[in-house]
UniProtKB/Swiss-Prot annotation:
<dbReference type="InterPro" id="IPR006430">
    <property type="entry name" value="Phage_portal_PBSX"/>
</dbReference>
<protein>
    <recommendedName>
        <fullName>Protein ORF5 in retron Ec67</fullName>
    </recommendedName>
</protein>
<comment type="similarity">
    <text>Belongs to the phage portal family. PBSX subfamily.</text>
</comment>
<dbReference type="Pfam" id="PF04860">
    <property type="entry name" value="Phage_portal"/>
</dbReference>
<dbReference type="InterPro" id="IPR006944">
    <property type="entry name" value="Phage/GTA_portal"/>
</dbReference>
<feature type="region of interest" description="Disordered">
    <location>
        <begin position="1"/>
        <end position="24"/>
    </location>
</feature>
<feature type="compositionally biased region" description="Polar residues">
    <location>
        <begin position="10"/>
        <end position="24"/>
    </location>
</feature>
<dbReference type="InterPro" id="IPR030935">
    <property type="entry name" value="PBSX_Proteobac"/>
</dbReference>
<keyword id="KW-0814">Transposable element</keyword>
Length: 326
């Protein structure tokens, strides 16, 4: 009997020892950049695929990001429109073709013009090739159009028929990269905030608050009537108010918790404003030219000399680069 008590005491001590040593504190969830793994590709520059080089950044991703946020696509449209307005149409290059050429350059950091000739070797037109699907060959003198489809396969452009305008990169010299890459996370954050708020309003299947009842004076019939009233208040965009009469009820027996207080914690306006400022800093276009209204009533509605000079300097730089077409 004494031996069993000793064993029981030893087992109890062992359980206490395990309970004392099993407690463990650790941290997790440290923020990690989602693009840090891509830095490994900088060691190999552009990846060789089949008969051409792939760009260091996904052009398909840049195309989808173009319309992710209004403050990202608007400055690109401003620059494209200004450059197109300064262009003098040429018999070989129409104004619409030049606009496509400029847009590809601003979005992808690369723009291509294909020289098309007749059977006699005479140039009949200069047509922009879609930068999203144009790749540079392994010898760097040839170009490929790599759009796959039901009836299309990659084909090689005639050697010497492609003019390539690129925005220089610091890691490789095969492709160009746009200057707004640092603002892409802000553009995606801006889009996510807008979609989150939009889903909140579309959902709308609530009465706008939580009713918390602890009053014992209520009978089951009153509770059922209140439940039916809450159910009838549901519906898209239905924010109704309810009235309840509770004689001899407690002060805190019925509590109303508005859902708007919970929704206000997502910092929607701050996220939109901060991400907007990041995109504007990357594109360097005055807010007046992007159609942004000033926050204060006394704000300047027109584009001042300083803002216009900054934009004009940027446009002149792009114009000088496009002059290489001639």
């Amino acid at each position: 009997m004494g031996k069993s008590k000793k064993n029981r005491a030893a087992a109890t001590n062992q359980l206490k020892h395990k309970s004392q040593t099993s407690a463990e504190a650790f941290s997790f969830g440290d923020p990690v950049p989602v693009l840090d793994r891509r830095e490994l590709l900088d060691y190999v520059e552009c990846v060789q695929t089949d008969r051409w080089y792939e760009p260091p950044v996904s052009f398909d991703g840049l195309a989808r990001t173009f319309r992710a946020a209004v403050h990202h696509s608007s400055p690109i449209a401003v620059k494209c429109n200004i450059l197109t307005s300064t262009y003098i149409p040429h018999p070989l290059l129409s104004q619409q073709a030049f606009s496509r050429f400029v847009q590809d350059y601003l979005v992808f950091g690369n723009a291509y013009l294909e020289k098309r000739t007749n059977r006699f070797g005479e140039v009949i037109a200069l047509e922009p090739a879609l930068a999203k699907y144009t790749r540079r060959g392994l010898d760097l003198d040839t170009y490929w159009f790599v759009q796959y489809g039901m009836t299309t396969q990659p084909y090689q452009f005639t050697k010497g028929s492609i003019f390539h305008l690129l925005e220089p990169d610091i890691n490789q010299e095969i492709y160009g990269l746009p200057g707004y890459l640092s603002a892409i996370p802000s553009a995606l954050l801006n889009e996510s905030a807008t979609l989150f708020r939009r889903k909140y309003y579309i959902n709308g299947s609530h009465a706008g608050f939580i009713m918390y009842m602890t009053d014992a004076a209520q009978n089951q019939e009153d509770v059922n009537n209140l439940r039916n009233a809450m159910k009838s208040a549901k519906g898209p965009g239905n924010f109704r108010n309810l009235f309840m009469y509770s004689p001899n009820g407690k002060k805190d027996g019925l509590q109303i918790i508005p859902l708007s207080e919970v929704a206000a914690k997502d910092e929607f306006l701050n996220i939109k404003n901060v991400s907007r400022d990041d995109m504007m800093a990357a594109h360097r276009v005055p807010p007046q030219m992007m159609g942004i209204m000033p926050n204060n009533v006394r704000g300047v509605w027109g584009c001042g000399k300083s803002e216009f000079s900054v934009c004009e300097e940027r446009i002149n730089t792009l114009t000088e680069k496009d002059a290489g077409i001639k």
